[in-house]
Amino acid sequence: MKRIGVLFWCFILCGFFGVCSTVAYGEKPDGAQGGEISKLVGDWFGESICVNKEKFPACNDEQVVYHVVVPSGKTDTVTITADKIVNGKPQAMGTFDFTYDAQRQTLTSEVKNDRVHFIIELAVKGDHLEGTLSTLPERTLVRRIKVKKDERAAKP
């Protein structure tokens, strides 16, 4: 069982944040929800903290940077390219599509493949995103995530 946990966590670190290194190009969507979702575009800095070292011993706390764009033609989706900071430099972890729920003010991304199944849920709180990464279907909490938008990048 411990081997499965270590393998799972290795996938989380290398797979979740390193699978897709593509860069998404975005544009501002139209409409009310589009106006709300466009406010998410930019760079977000913060932390991803392990909360269950017993079950996921390979888990490491990380400083993270999320680059958020709205994919062309989408009004309810953002693409987040995630980096972790290693020795002061960004290291690509992956790119994921999140569904935006304007009513609940949440972003959700579910990832499933032959080896893992997990969900990332983030609450939008103004210039902060706070949430969790949990395994599915059991919803075992793995990480707590807190990031803040870098407003300097948005200004000319």
Give short role names for the model-derived ranges.
Residues 27-31, 65, 91-97, 102-106, ...:
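Edge beta-strand at a domain terminus
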Residues 36-68:
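N-terminal secretory signal peptides
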